[in-house]
Regions:
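Helix-to-beta-strand junctions that scaffold the AdoMet/dcAdoMet cofactor pocket
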Residues: 31
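A beta-strand edge to alpha-helix "cap/lid" segment located at domain peripheries
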Residues: 1-28, 36-135
Length: 135
């Protein structure tokens, strides 16, 4: 498997863990060091494995959490690091987010070291269900 495909598979595993609420899988995806970071939409920067994973534990245990789909993935690989940029669609909310998921190869596995997502203003109307659109 090429590095690009392996990073895209790790990225898909991240979204699958989010979608299914699988905290154990989410924990396996993140690197085991305090150099990891995460910026959830509207949140301050979180730094450190314990803080980042606690944020996901709280999000995933919420039965009313947002449902995410992702699309338009692009993988960029440079040596032992790579990132995926993609669009996250928050189901039912009419919100599209630009996301960056950064991975590092650790012991032959691609592990997440950073996630960041923020709203894309130009795509808000496009992402909204037709019943919620203003035009």
């Amino acid at each position: 498997m090429t590095d690009e495909r392996a990073i895209l598979a790790a990225n898909a595993a991240y979204y699958h863990a989010f979608k299914t609420g699988d905290f154990a899988e989410m924990s396996r995806i993140w690197a085991d060091d305090d150099g990891v970071s995460c910026i959830h939409p509207g949140w301050p920067a979180l730094v450190g494995r314990q803080v980042v994973l606690e944020s996901y534990r709280n999000i995933l245990r919420n039965p009313d959490r947002e449902r995410l789909d992702h699309r338009d993935e692009k993988a960029i690989v440079s040596g032992s690091e790579g990132r995926v940029v993609c669009v996250e669609i928050v189901s039912g909310a009419g919100v599209a987010l630009a996301a960056t998921n950064w991975f590092r190869r650790i012991d032959s596995e691609w592990r997440m070291v950073h996630h960041q997502a923020s709203p894309i203003a130009a795509m808000l109307a496009e992402a909204a269900p037709s019943s919620q659109r203003l035009n």
